[in-house]
């Protein structure tokens, strides 16, 4: 059971993933080359979903880590104006989006609060700034999932956990 299953019809593609060794190499050319194989599977699955199952309904894209990269690439290269009008939001958790990407792709829009639609909800969780992967050094998209703010004000979960954003990193 997933977070969205009570309110959504859930579709999740099977796709080939690149190994952790590839990601840990920090070799962006190697990562990109290997990711393209996985991404072809994601594109085929999204197109099949759109053409056979969506039927004009609102939809959410969601992915974590490599899946978040796939979501970002779908937004860059597969989303058309017709498709975009049905997009509620894209959860791209655990990956990076640069300012250059935001400036270059019209469907990469950063969430600024809880009422935004057609936006990317993204963040990377770490216990301390030193733990941030070099792959995420230029990330610009971040919203606190506990309070839906993009500033440093802390959000508190119903379980008492506190999370805050450091806008300087």
Predicted segments with their positions:
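Short, solvent-exposed loop/turn and secondary-structure capping segments
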Residues: 22-24, 73, 102
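Active-site-proximal beta-strand/loop segments in catalytic clefts of secreted hydrolases
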Residues: 14-18, 63-65, 92-96, 126
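Surface cap/lid and interfacial helix-loop subdomains adjacent to catalytic sites
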Residues: 41-56, 76-169
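Gly/Ala-rich beta-loop-alpha elbow adjacent to hydrolase catalytic centers
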Residues: 61-71
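Active-site catalytic motif of lipid deacylating hydrolases and related acyltransferases
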Residues: 1-57
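A generic short-segment signal for beta-strand/edge and adjacent turn/coil regions
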Residues: 28-29, 58-62, 89-92
